Amino acid sequence: MGYDDRPVLRGVDLAARRTEVVAILGANGSGKSTLIRAALGLVPLVDGQVRLFGTPLRRFREWRRIGYVPQRLGAASGVPATVREVVSSGRLARRGFLRPAGAADRLAVDAALIAVGLLDRGSDPVGTLSGGQQQRVLIARALAGEPELLVLDEPTAGVDAASQQAFAGALADFVTRGGTVLLVAHELGLLEPLVTRAVVVHLGRIVHDGPVPEPAGHHAHPEHDHVHPHAPDSSGMWQ
């Protein structure tokens, strides 16, 4: 796929399987975020096809099965709402807009808030939370919908260590319950132990698909926390 006749992704052939935690890694501008946006139908394809849970994208309607947290989107977004109200909106795809919230919805929202460590902040305005806490609210919103596939675009970018630890715990619980995670990252940080498979994108092409690449040279120094390769190696749920 591409923008204005400029190719962004070329020759991508990729599938994610149930209970995998797949990290899409690469430098800024490599095409990794575009890859997952194309997989969700958020940007059009010039050629090729996408299948979600075995169904061609154009016929897929079961969006409640997917939870998506986009890149750098504040949970407040200018709307005066509490943490619980934002997280509760994640139930709409599952219960519908016309049916009022029931006991199952409230339990799911509580479970999502507990998973990200924000149950005690449920009545607080989202705008009063830190950036990392707002990102945790967005992940809780996605979890509240009880998806089977969780798609996260740079969820830990610029957030504090406590929030990263909360993300890691929430994702570990999600996978334990049979969920699948597709994660875009520039750095994995505390999420690295959860990753079962790493896909490295370089100049719009997949150049590595396997274990998380080991850092090399000065990037392997203990004080350097990069986990992605800075040059390409030689080397389902959606595809």
Regions found by a protein language model. Give the residues of each.
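Conserved ABC transporter NBD signature motif
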Residues: G48-E62
